[in-house]
């Protein structure tokens, strides 16, 4: 079983969910915890450079939670966003920056 670690952004979003949206997000995160890097489409997608996205519907939209894997069977969530064609490239770039910040911080310890 993989341990899911929430970034502040993802934790803030996740704790705001209720009802069916909370259930949908929890199901996908539980699946990620069980499958780890073996989780594939349509549930997860590899974006390159050790960056992945978890894919599901919540809040009546397609949601994405970006994440990476770390030592000790950890899944580190980075960002979350509403999937829209016009903002997808920008959001993936933002997730890559969050991943770089995480890796830099981890390297300092």
Task: Describe each model-derived feature in a short phrase.
Residues 1-62, 71-75, 81-109:
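Basic, Lys/Arg-enriched alpha-helical interface segments
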Residues 64-66:
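Short acidic loop-to-beta-strand element that houses the catalytic metal-binding Asp/Glu
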């Amino acid at each position: 079983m993989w341990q899911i670690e929430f970034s502040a952004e993802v934790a803030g979003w996740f704790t705001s969910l209720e009802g069916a949206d909370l259930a949908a997000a929890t199901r996908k995160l539980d699946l990620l915890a069980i499958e780890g890097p073996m989780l594939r489409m349509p549930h997860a997608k590899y974006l390159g450079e050790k960056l992945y996205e978890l894919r599901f519907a919540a809040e009546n939209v397609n949601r994405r939670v970006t994440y990476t894997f770390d030592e000790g069977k950890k899944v580190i969530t980075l960002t979350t966003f509403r999937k829209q064609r016009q903002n997808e490239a920008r959001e993936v770039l933002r997730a890559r920056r969050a991943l770089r910040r995480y890796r830099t911080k981890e390297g300092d310890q």
